[in-house]
Each structure stands twice: as structure tokens, then as C-alpha cells.
């Protein structure tokens, strides 16, 4: 997801997106630990999406 798309969302939507991404990251980490994960690049994508969401949340928090 692009940062410009995230900036259009409100704080509640961003928090919801963050919780979904964290759950996805947990699931991927468990799959990796049990050697069921085929595409390990998904971990990198989810990790960076989480960072993008947290960055936009920080920007919105500092605007107030």
C-alpha cells in the first residue's frame, strides 16, 4: 500500500489497518518458524507496510 493512499485515511482506519498488518505479520512469522512459508518476501512487504502506517499515524499525531 502506498503512503499517499494511507494519508487519505482517518486515524481509526489507520489503526485498523495496523492491527490487520500485525496479525498478518504474526501469521507469517509462525509459518516461517514451522517452515511452511514459501514466499519469504511477504515478510518484508508486511514489515514495510507496518512502518508506512506507523509513519503516517505519527504525521497525523504531530499535525494536531
Curated annotation (Swiss-Prot):
One cellular component term from this protein's GO annotations in UniProt: cytosolic large ribosomal subunit
Q: Where are the transmembrane segments?
A: none
The UniProt entry, under InterPro entries, shows: Ribosomal_protein_uL29 (IPR050063), Ribosomal_uL29 (IPR001854), Ribosomal_uL29_CS (IPR018254), Ribosomal_uL29_sf (IPR036049)
Which keywords has UniProt assigned to this entry? Ribonucleoprotein, Ribosomal protein
Q: Name one GO biological process term.
A: translation
Q: Which domain of life is it from?
A: Bacteria
Query: What's one GO MF term for it?
Result: structural constituent of ribosome
Q: Which Pfam families does the record match to this protein?
A: Ribosomal_L29 (PF00831)
Into which family does the record put it? Belongs to the universal ribosomal protein uL29 family.
Report what the protein is called: Large ribosomal subunit protein uL29
Lineage of the species this protein comes from: Bacteria, Pseudomonadati, Pseudomonadota, Betaproteobacteria, Burkholderiales
Amino acid at each position: 500500500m502506498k503512503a499517499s493512499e494511507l494519508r487519505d485515511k482517518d486515524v481509526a482506519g489507520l489503526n485498523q489497518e495496523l492491527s490487520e498488518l500485525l496479525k498478518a505479520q504474526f501469521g507469517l512469522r509462525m509459518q516461517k518458524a514451522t517452515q511452511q512459508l514459501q514466499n519469504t518476501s511477504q515478510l518484508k512487504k508486511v514489515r514495510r507496510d507496518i512502518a508506512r502506517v506507523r509513519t503516517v499515524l505519527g504525521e497525523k499525531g504531530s499535525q494536531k
